[in-house]
Structure formats: C-alpha cells, structure tokens
Amino acid sequence: MTTALEEQNTQQASVAGRVVRVIGPVVDVEFPRGELPALYNALTVEVTLEAVAKTITLEVAQHLGDNLVRAVSMAPTDGLVRGAVVTDSGKPISVPVGDVVKGHVFNALGDCLDEPGLGRDGEQWGIHRDPPPFDQLEGKTEILETGIKVIDLLTPYVKGGKIGLFGGAGVGKTVLIQEMITRIAREFSGTSVFAGVGERTREGTDLFLEMEEMGVLQDTALVFGQMDEPPGVRMRVALSGLTMAEYFRDVQHQDVLLFIDNIFRFTQAGSEVSTLLGRMPSAVGYQPTLADEMGVLQERITSIKGKSITSLQAVYVPADDYTDPAPATTFAHLDATTELDRAIASKGIYPAVNPLTSTSRILEPGIVGERHYAVAQRVINILQKNKELQDIIAILGMDELSEEDKITVQRARRLERFLGQNFFVAEKFTGIPGSYVPLAHTIDAFERICNGDFDHYPEQAFNGLGGLDDVEAAYKKMTEK
C-alpha cells in the first residue's frame, strides 16, 4: 500500500494475538481490542513439528468482527494449534529489491532459496503498492524488436506493454518465454524478472540451469511459487516479482522485462483462496473478485516517463476454450496477443504462432510505418485466402484451383514455413544455431516472397530458418545434391 499506511502499520508492530481456528491454509486469529492488524499485513507464528521449529507467515485477508481476523497461510499449517501466539509485523509481506536480487532465486516471501539470508539486511519493499499516478505515465508508443520474424512483422510488441502468450498445454509457451529472456539479455543487456506462478518445480530448475549455462542469469531475478505450494503463495508470487521489477524501473530508471508463467495459475490460486474464505463463486466457479484481482496486478505493469516494465505473460487456456473467464479477463489488459496453435505445432513449425488470430494494437501505419503495415497485411491476406481454399483442396484437389489460387496456396506454404525460426534455447536439442533477424530484413524478406521472387524455390528451403541468406544457402545446397 502507500508509504503512509506502512508507517502507520509499523507503529502497530509486535502486537500479539492467538490462533482460534485452523482450517487448512485458512487461520482465524484473535487480537486484543483496538489492535487489529490492517488488511494485507503479514503475521508470523512459531510452529514446532517433530522437534523441528519453523516460522509460518500469514497474510490478513478479512476482518471478521469481535477482534478476529481471517488470514491465509503462506506455508503448510501442519503442527499449528489453537492458542499459538501470532505476531503482527505491522507491514505487508516485503521482498528485497535492487541489484542484490539479480542472479538469484527467491520465494514469494522474499527469502533467497539459493543463498539463504541474502537481501534481508538491505532495502525491502512491500508487495502491495499503488500503480503510478496517471500524470506520470508514458504517452509515447515504441516497438520492442525481438528478432523473431512472426512476432516483429505480424504481432509487434509494445515497449512497456503487456503481451499475452495464449495456448493449451505443450505448444511452447514456456520455451518462447525462455527465448525472450535470452534475446533481451543478449541484444539489449536488459534486466529481467521471472515470476513462476504455480508451474512445475522441474521447469523452474531447468530454467535456472539453462540461464546459468547461457550466461544470462546475472541479469535476471527469479521468483517462484510453484504448484506444490499453498494457494496463498501462488496468489502473491506475481506481486513479489512485480515489486522487484518496479524498483528497477522507478529507482534505477531501467527498462525492465517481467515474465509471468503462468498468469492462469494466478487466477486459479485466487479462486482457491476465495473458496477457502467462503465467498460465493461466480461464473464457471471462479472468484467474484476475478476482474478486480487481475486489474490490481495489471495496472502496476506500465511505463512511466523515461522507463518501462514490459510484461510477457503465458496464459494457459483451459481445454483450449478462449471464452473461459480466466483468459477472457486477461485479454482486456493486453496490448498484444500471441496465440500458439496446436495445429501449427503439429506441422513442426516453431514458434507455433497463429498469424491469423494473434493481434497487436500497434500494427497500424501511423506507428509501425506504411511499408511494414502493407507487407503485414499482404502476408495475412495470402494466409487467410489459403485457409479459405483448404476445403476445396481437401475435396477436389489442387488441380481444380485457378492458376491465381494455385500461386496463392504455394506462396502461403512458403510463408508458413518461413514464419518458423530457430531459437537460441533450442540449439542443444536441434543442433541448429538460433537466429536474430532485424525487423528491416524481416519486412524485406516477406515483401519479396509475396512478390513471387522465390516462387521457383522448393518449400523445403524455407523450413524454420532465419533470414533470406539462410533460405538461399539451403536452396543452393539442395540444387547441388
């Protein structure tokens, strides 16, 4: 919350209460009259289980009246009993901020997992903060060049914007996020913060080891609240990561990238907490506060004058249903959407971005330029026409198409393959080096393909390569054989 509120809360620190009820991760605590902790305050309680002492952190979620508060535990409550003494910290959950967090792994409470105790002696910020004032927001729109052809041409990302990666399980959301972290560190020497929300512990370990191996870990802070942890942790880990990113933006005046994998798990954790707190469920069983919780997180991810937080959020789509309230609520906050399609992945084209359903609000002539916009529209029109012709091809075959339509289909197939690209993070699996294609080269390449300059090249020459130089090299190799 605000600094004034934190100062007020600090004055109330060390107030002691006692546990009166424990139901799973929900704990009711009674405090002396007139000394109730504020909402979102962190409470601590000492627990001994099998001769091992530990401290459990709780977060105040509700005031029940009669000097009672209902809190959500940030750890398993095994061993917690009625009558246990609970201490009010007088402030929200706080995490370390600054250069000390780079290259390390933290949990949602700000505890360093790879170097215990790191950062606790330095500056810390509460995870509940207000968004920047409206008059401080940046009004300028700028493209974030990624070097990934399909993204830069058809769904350009906004510097300081919010981008959603939509897709079902196993279509490449996490791989694309890892690739973006690598590219930002290599090309821009930028600071990144990765928030792992409710995902697999194995994925977090793999990410840490891969980033260490590729030499980008020193510019990245990682915050994890994985799927084996209580819902309170999974609901707060995104805010913890965002708070670290805000410090780099507001104090160190850096452009920061915030990666959230997976924003659906944030919603899912909120639903679990809502049910545990006894709230009436809303549509499809989600919490009635879904839109509010999403807004509180997303409104803090923004650009202020001279510095920005650009957020890339993986969005799991339950059963590939885009009308589900969780992805639908996320849509409203995004500047660009990148939809990963299982049908494209099944063709072996990666990244499996669907160019016809992915969108960007800045794909306009006034922002990206007339030529970029014109080439992007030509590519989309060819791919759309090819899609419309698929039913005719399936029933009657290619021979029944007009000559013009045959050319359209052949160019569309080349475009589809050329939209694929080798990734740096996939080098060790494919044995093929990753590629960074500048935006100017991308526009030129797709314009030439649309013009028919490569109609005599076989489709195989366009498979998942970088720029036109790679295509020409592949064609030369094929003709030599």
UniProtKB/Swiss-Prot annotation:
Is the keyword Translocase in the record?
yes
Q: Which reaction is recorded as catalysed by this protein?
A: ATP + H2O + 4 H(+)(in) = ADP + phosphate + 5 H(+)(out)
- Signal peptide positions on this chain: none
Q: Which domain of life is it from?
A: Bacteria
InterPro entries xref list: AAA+_ATPase, ATP-synt_VA_C, ATP_synth_F1_bsu, ATPase_a/bsu_AS, ATPase_alpha/beta_chains, ATPase_F1/V1/A1_a/bsu_N, ATPase_F1/V1/A1_a/bsu_N_sf, ATPase_F1/V1/A1_a/bsu_nucl-bd
Entry binding sites for ATP: 167-174
Q: What is its EC number?
A: 7.1.2.2
- Keywords, in A-Z order: ATP synthesis, ATP-binding, Cell membrane, CF(1), Hydrogen ion transport, Ion transport, Membrane, Nucleotide-binding, Translocase, Transport
The family database entries (Gene3D superfamilies) matched by this protein are listed as: 2.40.10.170, Bovine Mitochondrial F1-atpase, Atp Synthase Beta Chain, Chain D, domain 3 (1.10.1140.10), P-loop containing nucleotide triphosphate hydrolases (3.40.50.300)
Q: How the protein sits in the membrane?
A: Peripheral membrane protein
| One GO location term (cellular component) | plasma membrane
What quaternary arrangement does the UniProt entry report? F-type ATPases have 2 components, CF(1) - the catalytic core - and CF(0) - the membrane proton channel. CF(1) has five subunits: alpha(3), beta(3), gamma(1), delta(1), epsilon(1). CF(0) has three main subunits: a(1), b(2) and c(9-12). The alpha and beta chains form an alternating ring which encloses part of the gamma chain. CF(1) is attached to CF(0) by a central stalk formed by the gamma and epsilon chains, while a peripheral stalk is formed by the delta and b chains.
| Name recorded for this polypeptide | ATP synthase subunit beta
